[in-house]
Design a protein with these regions (language model features):
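Structural detector for helix-capping/boundary residues
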Residues: 12, 149, 174-175
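Core beta-strand elements of the Rossmann-like FAD/NAD(P) dinucleotide-binding domain
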Residues: 2-5, 167-175
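Glycine-/small-residue-rich beta->alpha transition segments that form the dinucleotide
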Residues: 173-175, 179-184
Length: 188
């Protein structure tokens, strides 16, 4: 392609798809992902989304639990920011069509997981990641071009990133966003 995309997103999991959806309408987006649409870590995530959405919960309690579970190694202000955004993220995903488990009363069926003093994990059985990816893909249909190819290098010119090299050739962009996950392999 000779004309660059407005943005090239490397990674087709939850982070990359959410970024694609947050771009203004009309933005030319390429999502470059190494695997087929259902591959990667995101669809395999079984747990829930911890968010203070229950009647016995609060953002402050969520942050307190998270900081305690972090055994002193988490940045407290970052924890508070992330916990504060949790309820809005759950609502946003619901507005996109994510189907989370609900009780007989129609309210979210919250699970209590490790480190939580109250039940706060929103889930879809044991396939929460798969459901979130499904909802994001559905909501983003037609918003981005998916390029199924492994990225092998960042393309640089005059001190800035201008795209990515893939196994199938270059993909140029005015901006490049890395949403590749895989941090767990850091220690492998």
């Amino acid at each position: 392609m000779t004309q660059p995309y407005d943005i090239v997103i490397v990674g087709g999991g939850i982070a990359g798809l959410a970024c694609a959806l947050s771009a203004p309408a009309g933005t030319r987006i390429a999502v470059v992902d190494k695997g087929e649409a259902r591959a990667g870590s995101s669809p395999l995530a079984q747990g829930g989304i911890a968010a203070a959405v229950g009647p016995e919960d609060s953002v402050e309690l969520h942050a307190t639990d998270t900081i305690a579970a972090g055994a002193g190694i988490c940045g407290e202000s970052m924890v508070r920011d992330i916990c504060g955004e949790g309820p809005d993220v759950v609502a946003w995903l619901g507005s996109l069509g994510a189907r989370f488990d609900r009780g007989s009363d129609g309210e979210l069926d919250l699970a209590r997981e490790g480190g939580q003093t109250v039940a706060r994990s929103v889930h879809t059985a044991d396939a929460t990641g798969f459901e979130i990816v499904r909802a994001l893909r559905e909501a983003g249909r037609g918003r981005a071009e998916r390029i199924d190819s492994r990225s092998t290098a960042l393309l640089l010119a005059d001190g800035r990133c201008t795209g990515v090299m893939t196994e199938d050739g270059p993909v140029l962009g005015r901006g490049v966003l890395l949403a590749t996950g895989g941090a767990g392999a850091l220690w492998a």
